[in-house]
Every structure is written in structure tokens, then in C-alpha cells.
Amino acid sequence: MGPAVESPEKVKELIEAGMNMARLNLSHGGYEEHQNRLDRVREAAKAAGKPIAILVDLQGPKIRLARFVDGPHELERGDIFTITTDEVEGTKDRVGTTYKGLPGDCKPGDRILIDDGKVTVEVVEVKGNDVVTKVIQPGAVSNSKGINLPGVAVSVPALSEKDKEDLRWGMKAGADFIALSFVRNAADIKDVHAIMDEIGFRIPVIAKIEKPQAVDNLEEIVAAFDGIMVARGDLGVEMPIEEVPLVQKRCIELAREAAKPVIVATQMLDSMIINSSPTRAEATDCANAVLDGADALMLSGETSVGAFAIEAVATMARIIARTEEGGFEMIRTLRTTPKTKGGAITRAAAEVGAIVGAKYLVTFTQSGDSARRMARLRSPIPIVAFTPEVGTYNRLALSWGVEPEVTPMVKHTDEMVKQADTLLIQSGRAHIGENVVIVAGSPPGIPGSTNAMRVHVVGDAVGGVAPAYR
């Protein structure tokens, strides 16, 4: 979300074009601005009758240049350029940085990338608070441009003071997900959970994979966090660019195996910031992410500041739909066997559904866990998830192939089946006499207690009679 889609009309158009989740990037803008955006999304989602998740994306400990007196400044190859932790007015030769630990983390020979690698400098020496560098790749530098140190394990905390305040705001504002930037290992989630526990509840945390250390610790990160974002922007700066496609595939594979949603982000349709149609390479990139098994594809500048925001969403939605329609069998099946009771039951339900020709796979879920386990299987049978929790309803918008519905809590399994009958028939999803496979926990109301599967004939629980031709 951003200036290009501020009006209620634009938000409505985004949803109509295919948006499932709105991202609030707290690297830019104030709380009032983001609260207004969140409120507009909630209002438009309610009017459309669709689940739309809200993702609050924390800036993270991004290392940046400080401000220049004037500028931007063009650096030429061979120029000496000093980055200092002193409070200085920036010039072409010397500028400050937001990261006070920079001199301690650098050594001669290290390369520093500025503005996503548009400018490259090499450390010549470290003198007190100054990191003296020589320009290797020339280009322009200006206020607050990001700094990357490939291969250097910078000693920054997982959460900056700004991130802590932003997290508290996001929780109170009603976010469905929090995205944590520059995750390095599983322990990075501890500070997030500590603040959530102070507030009194937790919401899912998405780990942004954009550092080499995160790639090295990918399995433990997937286990500790609630989802993954393949943040290819910084990842492609911090690592050799040729590694990024393989990292993307591994992230998706591990997240799917763990039944956790995975988002592929950055430059998906980048040319649509200024053009009304994407490049062929961008269209293919989107399709390949779908075939890799991603749950969601993310647009950034395309919709926040782009000239063709609505068109970008509609274009991406068409690419996704066509890829799934024509290439569904190319999506890799999971190679792992279920490790939990819930995993075994959802897998069995998908297999039985295929055998009996089920119209839908139906899950009753409080936490969304059984729906996510079903989604990772990529069954061609659509999934309906009935939940009494509005938060779960919104969050399941991120999971592949799930159609969530809010339903009242019931106390008995038979009541759940009646609910399924009533809602499937009323919504027109299924007709009397058709088969569905229902997955639930018995007794109802206990999160994570999936232990039952049944093949159900629609209408049986409400006294329906199938047409004779069936």
C-alpha cells in the first residue's frame, strides 16, 4: 500500500483485481497514515465480503547513510569516500551512517554496497570512527540510501527501538501478520514474542529471508516462525545473484513441508511501475514462483507508487490463474510423509476426496492449522475452511487455495456437519447429493486437535433429497 492507492475507490479496485493481502511498509510513513490505510482495507474487504489479510512489515535494523548538505553526489571510480559514525554534515567525501557499529564490523578489503549495489566501495582502512573506502563501482549517493555488507555478520539487534514501537503499534492497530526484516536465525523471534507477550497475545510472524545467515539457518527459521518471505531485493545484494533462484526454491520447499505460508517478493512486475504491461521475463518469473509452490506473490513499488497499480494486480492475478489452470500438474508433490496426526488426516482426506470425486475439502478450524496442512498438498479439489475466529478468517487469505468462512462455534460434531451442509448449499458451492470430505477435531473447539475425517453427502445432515438423476 502507498500513495498510488490511497483512496477508498482504489482499495476497492485492488480487491476486485485480486488482492488477498495488504502490506503496510513501516519503513515509510507515520502511524496515522498507516492506520488510515488499514481502516480503508478493512472497510473495503467487509463491503466485498472477502477475507483480506493485513501484513505490518517492520523496517528492521537497516543500515543507511545519513543526510548530505546537498546532493545527490556522483562518485567516480577511484574516489576516496569516508563513512563515519560521527555526527557530520554529509559531503561528497564524507558522510555519516545510522549504524554506530560499522567501524567494528569492517576491515580492509571488505566491500560495501550502497543503494542495493548501484554503488560499490571497498574498505581501505578503519580509523577510529571512520571507515575509509575507495569507489569501485561509481554512481550517485544521496540521503538515507541503504548500505549492505555482503559476507559480514553485522552486530545489530533483531529489533531496533523503532521496530519495537512499530510492532506495538501494529499489534494494537489490528494487524494479521508481522514481517520481521533481516532475520538471521531462529532466536530472532524471541524479542518479537517478548513484546507480544507484554501486550497479551501473539499473532503470526513472517521471517524475511534476505541475509546469507538466514539461508544458512533456513530450517531452524522455518521451524520457529509462522511463515517465510523470500525478500529477493536485499538477498540479491547480499548473495551472488545466481544463488537467488535456488534459495527461492529451497525456501518454498521447506515452508510447504512445514505447512507454513511462503511469499515470493521483490521485482515481480517491476517494469509496471512505469509501463502498462510487464516484460515476458517478469510474467515467467511469476509463473515459475507459482510452479515452485509459493502461496503468495507480492507487489511492492508496482502498487505503492506505480502508475499502473490496479493493472499490476490484475495482470499478476491473470498470470497466476492461467499458470494454475494449465500447469497444475507441474507443481511438485511433497516428498515428505506427514509427521503429525493432523498432517496424516489432511493428507488422507485429500486422497479420499480424489477417489470419491469430492466437490470440496472442508475443514473446521480455530487456528487455521488444518487448512494450511491441506493447502500444502496442492489438491485440485478446492478447500473451504469454516472458523469461528475472524483473525483466522483473515489470515487464511494468505494460504493457497483456501476459501475461509466465519461460522459460529458449535459444541458437537453433528452440528458442524449441519453447518457445512447449510453453508455449502446456501453459498451455491455444492448441491444436494454431492460428496465432500470433512476434516475436524472432535470434540470441537480445541485448537490443533484434528482427529476426524468423514465423507459426507451434501444435504444428508439437513434432510435434503438428491435429485433422481444423481
Predicted region positions:
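Non-catalytic helical/linker scaffolds that mediate oligomerization, partner binding
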Residues: M1-R470
